[in-house]
């Protein structure tokens, strides 16, 4: 992982709402969750959630897919694994 990509991902997670969103998606697993379920679980207005999901997506921490009427978001475990490898390489 390039340093600039790591900085972007870590910066995205350094915000409480985005970290909570990402943790929820990690717990949900590869199947992910609909945006409406995320907003409900976190008690977050849909417009705020949309902003945070966009930031997480720009940092390659989440991916989205259309499923019927819903947009499903899921954590990108490959990105987090790459971040963890950076830490492991320097221990």
Mark where each language-model region is:
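A short, conserved structural fragment
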Residues: 60-63
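Conserved small/polar residues in nucleotide/adenosyl-binding loops
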Residues: 89-91
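Alpha-helical residues within the helix-turn-helix
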Residues: 40, 57-58
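N-terminal helix-turn-helix DNA-binding core of bacterial DNA-binding proteins
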Residues: 4, 9-45, 67-79
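Short, hydrophobic-biased segments on the C-terminal half of alpha helices
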Residues: 53-54
């Amino acid at each position: 992982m390039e340093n600039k990509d790591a900085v972007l991902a870590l910066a995205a997670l350094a915000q409480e709402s985005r970290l909570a969103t990402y943790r929820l998606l990690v717990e949900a697993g590869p199947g992910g969750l609909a945006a409406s379920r995320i907003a409900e679980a976190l008690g977050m207005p849909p417009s705020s959630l949309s902003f945070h999901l966009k930031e997480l997506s720009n940092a390659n921490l989440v991916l989205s897919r259309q499923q019927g009427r819903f947009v499903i978001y899921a954590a990108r475990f490959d990105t987090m694994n790459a971040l963890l490898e950076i830490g492991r390489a320097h221990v």
